[in-house]
């Protein structure tokens, strides 16, 4: 009878090792060279404890990326965490918000890991599953080219909605094109591309 509880503990340990890492673990992983996605940026903004009405406005707003950029810049005094974002991070956050807001029930989840996935998440979950992530993140391509690749027969079977494909392509336009010397040696693909 001891065998079954021991087997359960071993199985739970193996399963836990395969579960997604928490948002704050991104800075500790081998993929830290890949810029933060909007989910991580939004989680850090929320974790800075801005006024409740500002959080509600973020969760319930529906804007284009450019409108979100203006909104975020206009609210940087009341949401101080926005002041520490680079222009690229602000644009990445605005892009994420344009795809994912308003949230259901117009409320920010208490657990930031329950926020919708961002482009970085999709790249690591969907692209890395078939080839080294370097193939993706070292390429600088326009959105139409990313979408063209995602609609090829070799990629169309990837389980992403059309909106998620758009979001992934948009994230890559903003954040890919990482110089190869910034990629850890063990992840270099030797110049591979699509």
Short names for language-model regions:
Residues 19-25:
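Sec/Tat signal peptide C-region and signal peptidase I cleavage site
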Residues 60-61, 139-145:
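Short cysteine/histidine-rich zinc-coordinating motifs and their immediately flanking basic loops
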Residues 25-46, 52-61, 77-82, 87-89, ...:
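Electrostatic cytochrome c docking/interface patches
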Residues 69-75, 147-160:
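Short microdomains enriched in Cys/His and/or Lys/Arg
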Residues 8-18:
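Bacterial N-terminal signal peptides
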Residues 45-53, 93, 123-134, 168:
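The canonical Cys-X-X-Cys-His
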Residues 1-9:
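Bacterial N-terminal signal peptides that target proteins for export
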Residues 83-106, 161-194:
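C-terminal capping alpha-helices of c-type cytochrome domains
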């Amino acid at each position: 009878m001891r065998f079954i509880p021991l087997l359960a503990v071993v199985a739970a340990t193996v399963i836990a090792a395969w579960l997604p890492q928490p948002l704050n673990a991104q800075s500790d992983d081998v993929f830290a060279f890949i810029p933060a996605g909007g989910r991580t940026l939004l989680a850090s903004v929320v974790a800075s404890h801005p006024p409740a009405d500002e959080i509600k406005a973020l969760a319930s707003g529906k804007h284009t990326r450019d409108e979100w950029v203006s909104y975020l810049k206009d609210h940087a005094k009341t949401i101080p965490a926005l002041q520490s974002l680079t222009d690229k991070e602000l644009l990445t956050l605005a892009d994420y918000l344009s795809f994912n807001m308003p949230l259901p029930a117009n409320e920010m989840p208490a657990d930031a890991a329950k926020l919708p996935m961002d482009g970085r998440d999709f790249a690591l979950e969907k692209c890395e599953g078939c080839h080294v992530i370097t193939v993706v993140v070292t390429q600088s391509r326009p959105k139409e080219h990313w979408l063209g690749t995602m609609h090829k027969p070799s990629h169309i079977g990837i389980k992403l909605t059309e909106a998620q494909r758009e979001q992934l392509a948009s994230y890559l336009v903003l954040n890919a094109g990482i110089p190869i010397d910034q990629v850890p040696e063990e992840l270099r693909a030797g110049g591979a591309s699509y």
